[in-house]
Amino acid sequence: MSSTPVIGRIPVRDVRPAVDSGRRPAKAIVGETFEVTATVFREGHDAVAANVVLTDPEGRHGPWTPMRELSPGSDRWGAEVTPDVEGRWTYRVEAWSDPVGTWRRVARIKVPAGLDTGLVLEEGAELYTRAAAGVPEGPQHAVLLAAAMTLADDSLPVATRLAAALTPDVDAVLARH
């Protein structure tokens, strides 16, 4: 058996802050905001997303803080976090495949070019419907369902259908859930 660490389909590497390659704790004071960064990538062209998960001194997980790509195409992600009580905090970076992010990137390219428009919009409607299922009933749930219904509505112009899926309201719901 090898003692080489297993790297999954979405590696998370070079997580910082780290002192002495993670052998010693990084330090901050209560209320001090600091940035956690990591290299997050995957093979192929599918999008990824990542969160920083803080664990407080009592062992409670959260809050989950969404990370953002620091420089497009760099695979370097970051998020600012703030410990709110004294004690030994830990953090980890979680990463996953982002099918909605992948669809949004592809749709922004293919739909204006007239490539596979019907299929792309149908896939988007299905993805947004699935995403809505993970959002509690209420206004945010309704935002995603409305976007899904508009994407699926063949009676509307293609540009209108796509635009409904890319609004700031939809962005906000997707970022939160």
Where are these regions (language model features)?
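Non-catalytic, glycine-rich low-complexity segments
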Residues: 1-43, 106-135
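Catalytic cores of nucleotide-enabled group-transfer and carboxylate-activating enzymes in metabolic
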Residues: 3-6, 10, 18-21, 28-83, ...
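Basic K/R-rich, polyanion-interacting modules in nucleoproteins and related proteins
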Residues: 30-34, 170-177
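Extended acidic/polar, glycine-enriched regions
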Residues: 66-123, 127-174
